[in-house]
């Protein structure tokens, strides 16, 4: 065992003494040491319950003959960080989480890992650590929140973001009832999208992604994961032996079929890089063209994660997609994906048929995400095309330019933005932000003003997984490094053509050259601290925004 280097032989008597100080017995010292990376904290509804899940995981490890060692990682609530400077810290936390798991696993020479994340950047950070460390690893995501219910309809947090401008008694009702308890926000936003990716990659047990936070099924999956990790250690089945390029392509197809968050196009390449796999944005676009959209989940559709869980979850989606997937890839069950799917039977056949469309009769003929390129985004940009109304798939309009999210909010709320406009929010990229903030507040303000089907928004920042409408993010190169988005001026015409994957600035090249000659990079918004270090080493969003 890898951990023997810390505990075997007479020279390790001091190490054993320290282990015994924590109540570890001689018999336990001979067993596999399993790290349990628990991201529980009291800021994040999706993480408030993770101590219970960790206890179930540890019970499973003990049942199977291992010894669990729990440690913590940080976790930011993107909802609470939204709309102010705190959001700059969310994306940088991804690599800090990854680093912290590496430090604990390597310092203590753990034999295996069970990773327990739930929310937006925390799941990717854990998955990146799995690839970097290449230990036997299982991911147990914390599970979705149940949808709220008020005014005779199901609700989630995005309803509150979109309707706060109305104020009054209805806002108080939404505030009280939209988020009824523990779990990640109830639609297919970034957290749940990434949980689905963990399962689609083969790193979570079947059913894990959609098993809800308050469901006993989640506790059973956690316990079984603890038992299974000991088996993976015995078999030497590490993360890189399970996850391959084919696994990532399977995951991208699932992403397209469920209409996942645009943030998957940022996180999956970053995760792949830690597995020594180059997952280009062009792969997302190619697979999107080949993979129909099968599940119409919030924010683009009517269904919540609870509906998908009742319909059979990620396994049901992969079963539908089986003719398009590589079924030879391994999973943490120790079986191939084909063997796992051969055992799948929907518990609720009616819900399965109603929630998950067929390849022959999909919700949309193409997948959820499109990659746009052109003179405004030479390296690419990302849009959730299945959440865009048909009349806005092709649009041309004048630019209304803002150099920060705060400026854009003032402009939108004061009525500067009119139907037909293209709002441009720049200097919010990985370096420029720094931190590539999610611009949910501006998109929600546009939706709340009834303009989501007549106004487009373009940014070098990101969007929340809860964003809907013609919102194009991750524009690369970003403004802070002199990308074309830095040269846009008010009134410039911008052309959006999602079916043909184009995003163009309709300004003569000679004019752009003159603007480029006079452009100067802005002064950094931060000096010192983690954000300063981050902006100096972060790469383009088109490469996953990883650190170099």
Curated annotation (Swiss-Prot):
It is an enzyme of class 4 (lyase). This is Dihydroxy-acid dehydratase. Mg(2+) binds at residues 78, 120-121, 438. One of its GO terms (biological process) is isoleucine biosynthetic process. Functions in the biosynthesis of branched-chain amino acids. Catalyzes the dehydration of (2R,3R)-2,3-dihydroxy-3-methylpentanoate (2,3-dihydroxy-3-methylvalerate) into 2-oxo-3-methylpentanoate (2-oxo-3-methylvalerate) and of (2R)-2,3-dihydroxy-3-methylbutanoate (2,3-dihydroxyisovalerate) into 2-oxo-3-methylbutanoate (2-oxoisovalerate), the penultimate precursor to L-isoleucine and L-valine, respectively. Its EC number is 4.2.1.9. [2Fe-2S] cluster binds at residues 119, 185. One of its GO terms (molecular function) is 2 iron, 2 sulfur cluster binding. The modification N6-carboxylysine is found at residue 121. It catalyses: (2R)-2,3-dihydroxy-3-methylbutanoate = 3-methyl-2-oxobutanoate + H2O; (2R,3R)-2,3-dihydroxy-3-methylpentanoate = (S)-3-methyl-2-oxopentanoate + H2O. Belongs to the IlvD/Edd family. The active site is at residue 464. Keywords: 2Fe-2S, Amino-acid biosynthesis, Branched-chain amino acid biosynthesis, Iron, Iron-sulfur, Lyase, Magnesium, Metal-binding. It comes from Methanothrix thermoacetophila (strain DSM 6194 / JCM 14653 / NBRC 101360 / PT) (Methanosaeta thermophila). Homodimer. The gene is ilvD. Binds 1 [2Fe-2S] cluster per subunit. This cluster acts as a Lewis acid cofactor. GO terms for cellular component: cytosol. Its cofactor is [2Fe-2S] cluster; Mg(2+). Pfam families: ILV_EDD_C, ILVD_EDD_N. InterPro entries: Dihydro-acid_dehy_C, DihydroxyA_deHydtase, DiOHA_6PGluconate_deHydtase_CS, ILV_EDD_C, ILV_EDD_N, IlvD/EDD_N. SUPFAM superfamilies: IlvD/EDD N-terminal domain-like, LeuD/IlvD-like. The keyword Magnesium applies. Pathway: Amino-acid biosynthesis; L-isoleucine biosynthesis; L-isoleucine from 2-oxobutanoate: step 3/4; Amino-acid biosynthesis; L-valine biosynthesis; L-valine from pyruvate: step 3/4.
């Amino acid at each position: 065992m890898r951990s023997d280097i810390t505990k075997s032989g007479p020279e390790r008597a001091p190490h054993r003494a320290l282990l015994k100080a924590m109540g570890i017995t001689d018999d336990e010292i001979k067993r596999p040491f399993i790290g349990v990376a628990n991201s529980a904290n009291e800021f994040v509804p999706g993480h408030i319950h993770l101590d219970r899940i960790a206890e179930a995981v540890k019970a499973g490890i003990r049942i199977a003959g291992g010894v669990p060692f729990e440690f913590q990682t940080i976790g930011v609530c993107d909802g609470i960080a939204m709309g102010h400077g705190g959001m700059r810290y969310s994306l940088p936390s991804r690599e800090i989480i990854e680093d912290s798991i590496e430090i604990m696993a390597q310092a203590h020479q753990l034999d295996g890992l069970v990773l327990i994340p739930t929310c937006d950047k925390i799941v990717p950070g854990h998955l990146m650590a799995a690839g970097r460390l290449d230990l036997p690893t299982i991911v147990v995501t914390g599970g979705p929140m149940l949808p709220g219910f008020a005014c005779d309809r199901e609700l989630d947090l995005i309803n509150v973001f979109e309707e706060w401008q109305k104020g009054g008694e209805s806002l108080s009702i939404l505030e009280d009832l939209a988020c009824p308890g523990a779990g990640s926000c109830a639609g297919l936003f970034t957290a749940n999208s990434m949980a689905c990716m963990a399962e689609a990659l083969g790193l979570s047990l079947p059913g894990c992604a959609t098993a809800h936070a308050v469901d006993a099924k989640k506790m059973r999956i956690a316990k079984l994961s603890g038992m299974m990790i000991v088996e993976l250690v015995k078999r030497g089945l590490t993360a890189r032996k399970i996850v391959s390029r084919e696994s990532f392509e399977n995951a991208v197809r699932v992403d397209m079929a469920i209409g996942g968050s645009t943030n998957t196009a940022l996180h999956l390449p970053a995760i792949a890089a830690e597995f020594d796999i180059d997952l280009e944005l062009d792969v997302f676009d190619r697979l999107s063209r080949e993979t129909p959209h099968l599940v119409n989940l919030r924010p683009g559709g009517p269904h919540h994660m609870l509906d998908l869980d009742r319909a059979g979850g990620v396994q049901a989606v992969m079963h539908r997609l089986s003719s398009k997937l590589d079924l030879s890839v391994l999973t943490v069950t120790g079986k191939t994906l084909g063997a796992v799917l051969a055992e799948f039977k929907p518990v609720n056949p009616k819900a399965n048929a109603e929630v998950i469309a067929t390849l022959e009769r999909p919700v949309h003929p193409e997948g959820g995400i499109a990659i746009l390129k052109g003179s405004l985004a030479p390296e690419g940009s990302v849009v959730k095309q299945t959440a865009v109304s048909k009349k806005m798939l092709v649009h041309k309009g004048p630019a209304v330019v803002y150099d920060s999210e705060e400026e854009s909010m003032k402009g939108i709320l004061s009525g500067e933005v009119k139907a037909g406009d293209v709002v441009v929010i720049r200097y919010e990229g990985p370096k420029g932000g720094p931190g590539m903030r999610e611009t949910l507040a501006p998109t929600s303000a546009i939706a709340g003003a009834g303009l989501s089907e007549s106004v487009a928004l373009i940014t070098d920042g990101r969007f929340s997984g809860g964003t809907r409408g013609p919102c194009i993010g991750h524009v690369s190169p970003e403004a802070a490094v002199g990308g074309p988005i830095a040269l846009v001026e008010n009134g410039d015409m911008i052309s959006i053509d999602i079916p043909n994957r184009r995003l163009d600035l309709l300004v003569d090249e000679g004019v752009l050259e003159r603007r480029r000659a006079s452009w100067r990079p802005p002064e950094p918004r931060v000096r010192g601290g983690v954000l300063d270090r981050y902006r100096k080493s972060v790469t383009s969003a088109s490469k996953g925004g990883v650190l170099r």
